[in-house]
């Protein structure tokens, strides 16, 4: 069962990336290191509802 999720950088409040995940394989919240246009560097984006 795949669901769409939004990734947010907590410090800047930036919600830049949309992705999918399989809830059965990854029940925990997803954390990915992605590029932030606002900060111009790679930072950790976390899953939000």
Swiss-Prot record:
Q: Which of UniProt's keywords are assigned here?
A: Ribonucleoprotein, Ribosomal protein
What the entry lists under InterPro entries is as follows: Ribosomal_bL33, Ribosomal_bL33_CS, Ribosomal_bL33_sf, Ribosomal_zn-bd
Segments passing through the bilayer: none
* Keyword check for Hydrolase: no
PROSITE patterns per UniProt: RIBOSOMAL_L33 (PS00582)
> Which superkingdom does the taxonomy of this entry point to?
Bacteria
The entry assigns this protein to a family as follows: Belongs to the bacterial ribosomal protein bL33 family.
Kindly provide the name given to this protein in its UniProt entry.
Large ribosomal subunit protein bL33C
| UniProt organism field | Lactococcus lactis subsp. lactis (strain IL1403)
Whichever gene encodes this chain, its name is rpmG3
């Amino acid at each position: 069962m795949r669901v769409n999720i939004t990734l947010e950088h907590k410090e800047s409040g930036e919600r830049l990336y949309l992705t999918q995940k399989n809830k059965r394989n990854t029940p925990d919240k997803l954390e990915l290191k992605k590029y932030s246009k606002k900060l111009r560097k790679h930072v950790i984006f976390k899953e939000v509802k």
